[in-house]
Amino acid sequence: MSMSQPSIDFSASSVDVARSLIGATLLVNGVGGRIVETEAYDHDDPASHSFSGPTRRNQVMFGPPCHAYIYRSYGIHWCLNFVCRPAGHGAGVLIRAIEPLVGLDIMRKRRGLSDERLLCSGPGRVCEALGITQEYSGMSIDTPPFQLTPPLDPVPVVTGPRIGISKAKDVPWRFGLAGSPFLSRPFRQPDIV
């Protein structure tokens, strides 16, 4: 069983960053919680937006690390990614779920529901609850409106295949906080890393 790192090095591989983010606290304009689920994507990964090279849509993924890359999924939901690896590489980590801890009333209002477990259990839900839209794309995540705090203590991390993709479906680059009820979906026969 591996534990998340005490600090997050965004110049590292997307897999390492995705694992390190589990247990970190993410606030956007003072609203957020603990990251409990992530997915890694890299330029040589056919499921990644960066696989075919830079485009107008994905240019931020090729920029410097530690920036937000926001895209709309299926033309409906915004999704938050953190860029990693050196500029020009094209890698990122999708924030799939957080455990809501701060600003719950704001999240409930934005999401139109009260069940805490459903407020941020999925990448579109995370963005809606935290008020994240395209305007945040390209912003540094180490300055306001973002506040990212690494976990204080190591946390148990599970891994398994990513969700909702049609290519490289079996690559085990989905990471989650072991036992969290706030995941977007349970891990099937997870590997504890």
Curated annotation (Swiss-Prot):
Keyword set includes Iron-sulfur: no
Gene Ontology BP annotations: base-excision repair
Molecular function per GO: alkylbase DNA N-glycosylase activity; DNA binding
Pfam families named among the record's database cross-references: Pur_DNA_glyco (PF02245)
Protein EC: 3.2.2.-
Keywords annotated in UniProt: DNA damage, DNA repair, Hydrolase
Superkingdom of the organism of origin: Bacteria
Listed InterPro entries: Formyl_transferase-like_C_sf, MPG, MPG_sf
Enzyme class: hydrolase
Family statement drawn from the similarity comment of this UniProt entry: Belongs to the DNA glycosylase MPG family.
Protein's UniProt name: Putative 3-methyladenine DNA glycosylase
Organism the protein comes from: Nitrosospira multiformis (strain ATCC 25196 / NCIMB 11849 / C 71)
Origin organism lineage: Bacteria, Pseudomonadati, Pseudomonadota, Betaproteobacteria, Nitrosomonadales
